Regions:
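Helix-loop "lid/cap" segments that line or gate small-molecule binding pockets
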Residues: 78, 94-101, 109-118, 193-198
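Amphipathic alpha-helical packing segments from all-alpha helical-bundle domains
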Residues: 69-72, 76-77, 102-105, 121-147, ...
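Residues in soluble alpha-helical coiled-coils and helical-bundle/repeat scaffolds
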Residues: 4, 54-58, 62, 80-84, ...
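Hydrophobic/aromatic-rich alpha-helical bundle segments in the mid-to-C-terminal region
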Residues: 124-128, 132, 146-194, 201
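Helix-turn-helix
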Residues: 16, 24-58, 62
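Generic hydrophobic, amphipathic alpha-helix propensity
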Residues: 10-22, 38, 63-67, 71, ...
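Hydrophobic alpha-helical connector segments
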Residues: 62, 66, 76-106, 157-163, ...
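N-terminal intrinsically disordered/low-complexity leader segments
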Residues: 1-12, 202
Length: 202
C-alpha cells in the first residue's frame, strides 16, 4: 500500500471511529461509555481504536474538534453567499437554531464536554476557541453593518457577547426542558430582539 492510500485509510478509519464516538457519547454520556462500545458501534476491534487514538480522552478531544470544525464550515457556507449585514446576522441565527433541529444529539454531547472543562485543558481550549470564533463572526458582521450605516452599536464586543448569549442560552434552555416554550416561536422572537439591538431606528 502506497503512502497516499495509507493516509486515505487512516482518515477513513478516524472518521469512522469519530462518527461512532459521537453516537455512543450522545446515547450513554461521557462517564458511561467505553472504548469497546465505540469499537462495536464502528464494527472494528478495540485494538484498532487504540491504534488510532491514544485513549478515551484523546478520542473525545478529536471528536470535539471535528464537531466544531463541521459547525464552522456549515456557518461559513451559509454566510459566504450573502452580501448584506442584516442577512448575514439572520443567517448566523438561523444556522445556530437549525442545528438543534438537525443534530439535537450534538448538544447532549456538548454538555458532556462542558462537564470536562475543569479536568481537560484541551477540551477547555477547544470550547474557548469555538465561542471566540462565534463572537468574532458576529463582531465582523456588526462592524460591516456599521460601516454601511445599517447598524448602530456603541460597544461591538458587548453586543457580540449578548447576541451569542441570547442564541446559546435559548438553545440550552430548550435542550434541558423542551416544554418550557415553543421553540419555533422563540427563535423568531429572539431574532427580532437581536435585530432591535443593532438596527438603526428599530
Amino acid at each position: 500500500m502506497n503512502e497516499r492510500n495509507k493516509n486515505n485509510l487512516l482518515n477513513l478509519r478516524r472518521a469512522q471511529l469519530t462518527k461512532a464516538a459521537y453516537k455512543v457519547v450522545a446515547q450513554k454520556g461521557y462517564n458511561d461509555f467505553t472504548i469497546k462500545d465505540i469499537a462495536e458501534e464502528a464494527g472494528l476491534s478495540t485494538g484498532l481504536v487504540h491504534y488510532y487514538f491514544k485513549n478515551k480522552e484523546d478520542l473525545l478531544f478529536k471528536l470535539l474538534k471535528e464537531m466544531n470544525a463541521n459547525l464552522k464550515e456549515q456557518l461559513n457556507k451559509a454566510l459566504m453567499v450573502l452580501t448584506e449585514p442584516k442577512d448575514k446576522l439572520l443567517a448566523f441565527c438561523d444556522e445556530a437554531f437549525a442545528l438543534l433541529d438537525r443534530e439535537k444529539a450534538y448538544f447532549y454531547v456538548l454538555i458532556d464536554f462542558w462537564a470536562r472543562i475543569n479536568h481537560d485543558t484541551r477540551i477547555r481550549q477547544a470550547n474557548v476557541k469555538l465561542f471566540q470564533s462565534y463572537r468574532d463572526e458576529i463582531a465582523a458582521i456588526i462592524k460591516e453593518g456599521m460601516a454601511k450605516g445599517v447598524f448602530m452599536v456603541v460597544d461591538v464586543k458587548l453586543t457580540s457577547v449578548i447576541i451569542i448569549s441570547l442564541i446559546q442560552g435559548t438553545i440550552l434552555q430548550y435542550v434541558i426542558d423542551n416544554e418550557v416554550f415553543n421553540y419555533r416561536e422563540m427563535k423568531m422572537n429572539i431574532k427580532e430582539q437581536i435585530l432591535s439591538i443593532v438596527i438603526k431606528g428599530k
